[in-house]
């Protein structure tokens, strides 16, 4: 199969995709490669830059670099136009090379959800990290302050009075003044209630080894709300108490230079929030089936603001049984999130990754071709964050050829 044939069939899914709750509709089929068409090569050869992504051993996690770069450029342009900045979450890609790319293209910092993730990122040369999860244990606080001692632009979130005092003690022991932001709750997952935030801010302002920088308010519950107008109404309503808390702290003379939050689902909404400074976007980089299903400002059917750039290549293992086949991408390759993975080019197929090692595909209408053992398919992942965490490498491709291979720097860093 020629590169031209391969490229035209596989690139078509971006321009025409529309999502349902289970899969993405793509009018032009992806014909795939037969096993006999694969270039004989060792695994090491297949992993090198320059080979076709269809020659990679599977399951293989791939990102189309052109699409990813366009996603980043669109996010940066949109936020710049609305007067906001991006502070993207590393928990999406867990990859130092991508974090550095985001910083080089205009992001003001990188968010980390877990301390080990932050340690992996700084160890790989990523700076300007904001730790968005409070570290309640003394051991973790000491480690966070160790990062701050060597990286003056490190910011730690705090949401309890005793946590602030512990941070102050650890910062004093390390001989530093640590930058902190307050996690002001939106919902009931984490953070301090908005009404109580000013008192915590006043305490922090009095602690000699802490410097208050502002507040975070991330509303995770609204990011996947179906329909743009519904999402907009909910996002603006739920953050009203937080805006009031921000204004109370600002009026009392406290330093409130940061008002951060939001996400990929509300990237074009948060500019309407008074005093907001930056967005903690993540999935915009890759997209996934969950986000494709939420709808956009142009219509509730599909979230087409950003292109799906992250895919998993999988191989057919069994085709003996009617209207179904088995592949090598199970829950360890895709996770168990819903909606399930979308089979690119095959709108009649539904994918079930319920088995650890195997994926099951069923269909009620004929596929675009009769798939044989060794044929490969391309999948849009259900949820990009946990899917990335299943892999050691991401293959960066351009025009269906591997251009770069990135180590997933913070894979497994969940502590």
Question: Which residues does each predicted region cover?
Answer:
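N-terminal secretory signal peptides and thylakoid transit peptides that target proteins
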Residues: 2-21
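Glycine-rich tight-turn/loop motif centered on a GG-T
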Residues: 53-64, 128-131, 145-156, 226-236, ...
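Conserved, mostly hydrophobic/aromatic
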Residues: 68, 91, 121, 182, ...
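C-terminal segment of N-terminal export signals and the immediately downstream linker at the start
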Residues: 25-74, 78
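N-terminal capping/small domains of soluble enzymes
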Residues: 55, 60-64, 69-81, 93-105, ...
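Active-site anion/phosphate-binding pocket segments in diverse small-molecule metabolic enzymes
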Residues: 236-415
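Active-site-proximal beta-alpha core segment in soluble small-molecule metabolic enzymes
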Residues: 89-224
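Active-site loop/helix belt of alpha/beta enzymes
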Residues: 5, 172-177, 185-296
């Amino acid at each position: 199969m020629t590169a031209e044939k391969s490229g035209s069939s596989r690139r078509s899914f971006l321009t025409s995709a529309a999502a349902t709750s289970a899969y993405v509709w793509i009018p032009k089929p992806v014909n795939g490669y037969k096993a006999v068409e694969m270039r004989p090569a060792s695994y090491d050869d297949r992993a090198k830059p320059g080979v076709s992504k269809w020659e990679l051993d599977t399951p293989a996690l791939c990102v189309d670099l052109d699409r990813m770069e366009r996603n980043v450029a669109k996010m940066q342009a949109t936020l710049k136009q609305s007067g906001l900045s991006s502070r993207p979450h590393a928990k999406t890609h867990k990859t130092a090379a991508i974090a550095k790319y985001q910083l080089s293209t205009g992001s003001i910092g990188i968010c980390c959800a877990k301390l080990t993730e932050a340690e992996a990122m700084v160890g790989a040369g990523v700076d300007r990290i904001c730790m968005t999860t409070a570290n309640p244990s003394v051991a973790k606080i000491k480690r966070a302050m160790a990062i701050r001692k060597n990286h003056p632009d490190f910011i730690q979130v705090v949401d309890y009075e005793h946590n602030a005092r512990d941070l102050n003690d650890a910062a004093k022991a390390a001989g530093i003044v640590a930058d902190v932001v307050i996690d002001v709750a939106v919902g009931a997952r984490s953070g301090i209630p908005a009404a109580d935030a000013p008192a915590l801010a006043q305490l922090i302002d009095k602690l000699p080894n802490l410097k208050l920088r502002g507040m975070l308010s991330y509303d995770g519950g609204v990011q996947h709300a179906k329909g743009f107008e519904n999402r907009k109404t909910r996002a603006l309503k739920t953050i009203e108490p937080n805006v009031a808390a921000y204004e109370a702290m600002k009026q009392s003379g406290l330093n409130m230079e940061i008002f951060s939050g939001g996400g990929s689902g509300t990237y074009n909404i948060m500019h309407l929030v008074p005093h907001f400074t930056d967005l903690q976007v993540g999935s915009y980089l890759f997209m996934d089936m969950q986000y494709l299903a939420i709808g956009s400002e142009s219509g509730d059917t599909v979230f087409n603001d950003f292109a799906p750039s992250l895919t998993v290549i999988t191989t057919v293992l069994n085709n003996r049984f009617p209207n179904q086949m088995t592949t090598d991408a199970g829950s360890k390759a895709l996770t168990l999130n819903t909606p399930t993975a979308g089979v690119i080019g095959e709108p009649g197929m539904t994918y079930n990754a319920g088995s650890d090692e195997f994926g099951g595909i069923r269909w009620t209408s004929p596929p675009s071709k009769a798939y044989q053992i060794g044929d490969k398919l391309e999948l849009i992942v259900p949820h990009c964050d946990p899917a990335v965490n299943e892999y050691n490498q991401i293959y960066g491709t351009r025009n269906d050829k591997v251009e770069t291979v990135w180590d997933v720097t913070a894979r497994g860093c969940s502590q």
